[in-house]
């Protein structure tokens, strides 16, 4: 059964949300595609309509976190307009740190981000990681 555009959008959001939850609670290695699909109520084969692999789903989580943190920093900089540059920068860094703490995303970044990045197609070749 094919999904409507609306269903596709909602399932994609649900998969990303569940992958993020698992990233923080279980980690990438301990999370299976079966767990993700069961949580959102789709067949395992349907997962691959959204992501090429489990690793790509976790990479999408990294991209989502990056976008959110950029927005948090940008908002903090705007709110601190008029302060000296060093204070504005400090406000942005603190806002990002608070968000990482509040969401638990730092657990995923510390434990699995490098692995998620390295295991995505071409990740190592396009953007070599420091050793």
Regions from the PLM with identified roles:
Residues 22-56, 60:
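Helix-turn-helix
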Residues 98-131:
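Short secondary-structure transition hinges
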Residues 7, 11, 61, 81, ...:
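Conserved acidic
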Residues 1-4, 51, 78-79, 118-119:
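A short, mixed-charge helix-start or loop-turn motif at secondary-structure junctions
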Residues 9-17, 29-30, 50-74, 94:
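An amphipathic alpha-helix adjacent to DNA-recognition modules
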Residues 60, 74-103:
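Hydrophobic alpha-helical connector segments
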Residues 1-26, 33-39:
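Basic, helix-initiating cap at the start of DNA-binding domains
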Residues 2, 27-28, 70, 74-82, ...:
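Short, flexible helix-adjacent loops and helix caps
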